[in-house]
Amino acid sequence: MNLTSIPALQDNYIWTLNDDSGRCLIVDPGEAAPVLRAITENQWQPQAILLTHHHHDHVGGVAELLSHYPDLTVYGPQETSHKGANSLVGDGDRIHVLGLDFTIIATPGHTLGHISYFSHPYLFCGDTLFSAGCGRLFEGTAKQMFESFQKLNQLPDDTLVCCAHEYTLSNLTFSHTFYPQDTEIARYYHEIKELRSKNGITLPTKLELERKINVFLRTKDVELQRLISTEPDHLDEWEIFATLREKKDSF
């Protein structure tokens, strides 16, 4: 199976998976043109589209892709029913695409109906878990996003986190403010800074790495809790997470 990221819009990535026969699936096509180019250049045969949530930069290309490939199955949560999804899925559902079995994981927070798709090792998590970061809370609550992170954090170390935006460098800058002496964060920051200076793509990332560099996955850390609050013992872990998200909003 071959994993490809297609840059789109300002900082989006549209993910594709294709097998050796050229059959492919498409994840969160925010626009159609770059996907159609990739299909033509690689002689792919699209089989399905996976949608994580209803925002335009994730669904904007669906209608045009369906005009070219009207038989495509478009999987998505209920909130995408008016955005082109023709096969609605929810938490715990399983779908079979390209010979892979994907489990649907409800990951509300960014939107109320946001979902992620997991078929080891691939995790398509939209705007929930970013490399070194966390999606903004447009509809859901910090507690919902925290609980979504806990679900994703149960996946194996070698999970490939295929998120939808190139935010890694700015997220690492935020992480570094809490852990200025952390050698792993510092090392990775310089690696990513060099990569981005050449317009390189920082994704996918592995969950094993994210557990080391992503402050939103380190809310159990007593050192971090003390930086967040003078009375961390009086806060639930999700409240530490919520405070981090508030600080990131104004960072």
UniProtKB/Swiss-Prot annotation:
This protein's record includes keyword Secreted: no
GO MF annotation terms: hydroxyacylglutathione hydrolase activity; metal ion binding
Catalytic activity: an S-(2-hydroxyacyl)glutathione + H2O = a 2-hydroxy carboxylate + glutathione + H(+)
Disulfide bonds: none
Documented EC number(s): 3.1.2.6
Co-factor: note: Binds 2 Zn(2+) ions per subunit.
UniProt binding sites for Zn(2+) 1: 53, 55, 110, 127
InterPro entries associated with the record: Clx_II_MBL (IPR035680), Glyoxalase_II_hydrolase (IPR050110), HAGH_C (IPR032282), Hydroxyacylglutathione_Hdrlase (IPR017782), Metallo-B-lactamas (IPR001279), RibonucZ/Hydroxyglut_hydro (IPR036866)
GO biological process, one term: methylglyoxal catabolic process to D-lactate via S-lactoyl-glutathione
Cofactor(s) recorded in Swiss-Prot or TrEMBL: Zn(2+)
Pathway(s) served: Secondary metabolite metabolism; methylglyoxal degradation; (R)-lactate from methylglyoxal: step 2/2
Matching Pfam families: HAGH_C (PF16123), Lactamase_B (PF00753)
Gene3D superfamilies according to UniProt: Ribonuclease Z/Hydroxyacylglutathione hydrolase-like (3.60.15.10)
Annotated Zn(2+) 2 binding sites: 57-58, 127, 165
Keywords of this entry: Hydrolase, Metal-binding, Zinc
The keyword Metal-binding is annotated on this UniProt entry: yes
Function: Thiolesterase that catalyzes the hydrolysis of S-D-lactoyl-glutathione to form glutathione and D-lactic acid.
NCBIfam families the UniProt entry points to: GSH_gloB
Description of how the protein assembles with itself and partners: Monomer.
HAMAP family: Glyoxalase_2
Family of this protein: Belongs to the metallo-beta-lactamase superfamily. Glyoxalase II family.
Name assigned to this protein: Hydroxyacylglutathione hydrolase
Gene designation per UniProt: gloB
